[in-house]
Amino acid sequence: SGASSYGKLPCVYNGIVKRTVLDEIYSRTGTFFPGPSPDMANAIALSLVVKKHCFLDYPVSWAGACVKSGGGMGAMHKHALPIEDASWLPAGCAENWETVLPHFWTAATVWAESAMKALRRMDREDLLRSKFCVESVYGRFLVYSFSDRQRIRSLLKNASLPKVAKAYISAWFSRFMAFWKNLTLTTIGRAGSFRMIKDINDVVECEKYIHNNYPIKIEKWT
């Protein structure tokens, strides 16, 4: 998928990971986060080490975002700029950027870059050749960064255009579904399994509401 999301990958970001597992990643790469986006890079690396992991259908943590975070910038459509101007990225990131990716910082490109770097540093370049779909990155880039489309024009010459078109259509569909969910949430207060709860002002009130209305019950842990 071109690292378009975490999917069901194990994650230290909003997750709990055994220290010995993290140490194995460190011993193989010299870091716990072998890529410019720590969350995606660590998730990819963990997926190559972890033998078993599980998901709890209950929030044990809350993802934070502010106007200056990547998520906040994305919500304001300010999540695109030249790599050289992304001052928070690790030193040398621009010089070592993958040549098959647009030399531009967006959610699509930095996650793909992080996944590719993690696979390389974990000595799994075979997965880059057999599994990684760079056309998925191009398709999403055309949807979310259309005004900068000239940045991938040369890359499209060596790409599978049917795969790019498929990713492009899929990204538009996902964008429409997200818009529809937000619209129904704000108008009728629900969208599928999602509910909008009003008059909650901070994370403490949120935790109390969830604890009182959806108490966790774990009868057996294996």
Residue spans of the language-model regions?
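C-terminal subregions of glycosyltransferases and related glycan-biosynthesis enzymes
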Residues: 59-222
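A structural signal for well-ordered alpha-helical segments within the folded catalytic domains
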Residues: 20, 41-44, 109-113
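Secondary-structure boundary/capping signal
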Residues: 30, 54, 123-126
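Conserved glycosyltransferase catalytic-site signature
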Residues: 14, 35-44
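Donor-binding/catalytic cores of nucleotide-activated saccharide
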Residues: 1-32, 63-66
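Residue-level marker of positions within ordered structural domains that often coincide
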Residues: 27, 51, 120
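Catalytic donor-sugar/metal-binding loop of nucleotide-sugar-dependent glycosyltransferases
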Residues: 32-34, 44-62
